[in-house]
């Protein structure tokens, strides 16, 4: 587990400890007591990790395990990879590892192992969690289980609402520019990179550890559709910043990207539909130079909005 700043303040360290205690208790006998202690009465689970699977399973009468998924994956172990904290926020990046041995949102047990990423954005007040926002790599999960999105009785699919909120890039940069310090400078570099989608601001030796639309990119190449060209497929694409965190040498940014599907996307013909999904980016700096990034987009959400949830499965 990598901490963005292992020498963070006592207050931030307390927030991190509460967040990790909450996460590590899930599915254990200690969970009910831990939740009573670390979840505020006003706690808002703004987004669940399996957001799309849960939404599409709603009202179908399928047996499903509920919030913590332990009935479907009883040997689940979450492997923490990254931790960041700033102000009242804590971010956790972890891998969900488990064996699928129980019903899961309409998917019968497969006996297969999974190892997928999930990210959590948490807010705390007085040492308790008041908000949780989670996103799991649901496409990777379905691919590893070897299944498609379960069919609903009505034959339909439940697409997510357009993620279109957040702060304009220019406004975000101007706000950060009023805080002249290294952390703000790093955030400015990351925010400005979303103005053109051209990868500006990265050092020559920059490494991309994960592309945001990694599954669509791989599918597009494998299916003979060439490199994934989001800007051609969504020519009016624009991004808006939901939240940023900076600590030590690391910047986290959650933003919404969207527009009109006006061109071919990995072989999906233009639909004219409006799309908009959340994306998380983790950027690492050395001496003010952006040297590494890891990006994770809600690809299943995008495909649901296009009416093509199974195209890469």
Question: Language-model segments: which ranges?
Answer:
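C-terminal and inter-domain tail/linker signature
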Residues: 1-313
């Amino acid at each position: 587990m990598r901490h963005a700043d292992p020498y963070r303040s006592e207050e931030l360290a307390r927030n991190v400890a509460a967040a990790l205690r909450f996460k590590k208790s899930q599915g254990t006998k200690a969970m009910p007591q831990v939740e009573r202690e670390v979840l505020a009465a006003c706690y808002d689970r703004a987004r669940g990790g399996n957001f799309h699977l849960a939404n599409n399973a709603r009202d179908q009468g399928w047996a499903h395990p509920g919030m913590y998924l332990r009935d479907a994956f009883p040997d689940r172990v979450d492997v923490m990879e990254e931790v960041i904290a700033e102000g009242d926020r804590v971010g956790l990046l972890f891998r969900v590892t488990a064996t699928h041995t129980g019903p899961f949102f309409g998917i019968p047990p497969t006996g297969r192992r999974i190892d997928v990423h999930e990210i959590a954005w948490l807010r705390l007040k007085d040492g308790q969690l008041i908000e949780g926002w989670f996103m799991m790599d649901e496409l990777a999960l379905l691919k590893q289980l070897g299944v498609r999105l379960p069919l609903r009785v009505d034959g339909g699919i439940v697409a997510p609402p357009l993620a279109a909120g957040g702060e304009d890039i220019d406004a975000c940069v101007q706000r950060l520019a009023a805080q002249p310090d290294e952390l703000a400078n790093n955030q400015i570099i990351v925010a400005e990179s979303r103005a053109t989608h051209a990868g500006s601001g990265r050092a020559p030796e920059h490494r991309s550890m994960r592309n945001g639309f990694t599954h669509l990119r791989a599918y597009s190449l494998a299916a003979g559709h060439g490199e994934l060209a989001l800007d051609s497929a969504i020519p009016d694409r624009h991004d808006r910043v939901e939240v940023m965190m900076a600590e030590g040498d690391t910047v986290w940014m959650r933003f919404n990207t969207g527009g009109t599907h006006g061109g071919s996307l990995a072989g999906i013909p233009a639909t004219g539909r409006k799309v908009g999904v959340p994306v998380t980016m983790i950027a690492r700096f050395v001496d003010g130079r952006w040297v590494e990034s890891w990006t994770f987009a809600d690809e299943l959400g995008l495909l649901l909005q296009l009416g093509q949830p199974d195209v890469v499965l």
